[in-house]
């Protein structure tokens, strides 16, 4: 299973430089940062900025914009994606529902995320870029299933699943049995969609073996940066070492 390293665009360390020619290190960056900068090299803007010759994904930064109260328009994200055109995968603008959202507010976020995917997909189609939709997990699975079906009916090349972290980690305000239900939802998406499935934010070594068993294609993590700051590395299958 593929594991992408989430990274700020100007941060260090950059492990892909250390493993150059030895190991492919796919990375994920956020449009939340890219919206503030301009390409340095229009021939390969992202690869030049990151000093990376391998695979790069771009997340829309929807959660970051939402958590900071910033309203980002679809046209603005389309501009960023067009300027930084050399990534292999681009995720749609999403509005993750919180476990504490009531069903009305949660469904409004699902509706907006779907509308954004449709609009952004049409805009980027002109640039030859295919956008990946995101379906979020939420405690009211009736709502989730309706929007999952709507996304599958649009026949995307890949689906990303978000909103799982609070349910997998069983934080406050999530229903009893949430971890099992969230993992069952991942399995349902894999089975019903039948295509490539990426799970957002669950690249912990203790979780990735489970995702692989469920048939997930890829996931991502930013935890490696926190551990690296303390001189640690993450070990496949769980655990860490100095």
Label every model-predicted segment.
Residues 1-127:
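Non-catalytic, usually N-terminal nucleic-acid engagement modules in DNA/RNA processing proteins
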Residues 101-108, 130-198, 204-209, 213-216, ...:
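Glycine/Thr-rich beta-alpha phosphate-binding loop at enzyme active sites
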Residues 94, 222-223:
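Residues at the C-termini of beta-strands that transition into short coil/loop
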């Amino acid at each position: 299973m593929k594991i992408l390293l989430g990274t700020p665009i100007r941060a260090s360390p950059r492990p892909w430089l250390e493993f150059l020619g030895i190991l492919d290190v796919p990375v994920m960056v956020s449009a939340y940062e890219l919206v503030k900068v301009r390409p340095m090299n229009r021939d390969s803007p992202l690869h030049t900025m990151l000093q990376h010759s391998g695979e790069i994904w771009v997340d829309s930064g929807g959660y970051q914009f939402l958590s900071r109260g910033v309203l980002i328009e679809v046209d603005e994200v389309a501009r960023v994606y067009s300027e930084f055109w050399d990534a292999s995968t681009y995720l749609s603008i999403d509005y993750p529902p919180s476990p504490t959202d009531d069903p009305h507010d949660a469904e409004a976020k699902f509706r907006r995320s779907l509308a954004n995917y449709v609009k952004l997909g049409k805009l980027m189609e002109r640039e030859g870029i295919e956008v990946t939709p995101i379906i979020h997990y939420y405690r009211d699975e009736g709502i989730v299933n309706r929007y999952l079906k709507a996304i599958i009916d649009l026949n995307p090349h890949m689906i990303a699943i978000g909103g799982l972290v609070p349910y997998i980690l069983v934080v406050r305000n999530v229903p009893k049995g949430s971890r099992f239900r969230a993992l069952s939802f991942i399995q349902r998406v894999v089975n019903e969609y039948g295509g490539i499935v990426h799970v957002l934010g669950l690249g912990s070594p203790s979780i990735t073996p489970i995702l692989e068993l469920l048939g997930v294609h890829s996931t991502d993590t930013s935890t490696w940066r926190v551990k690296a700051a303390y001189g640690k590395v993450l070990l496949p299958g769980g655990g860490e070492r100095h």
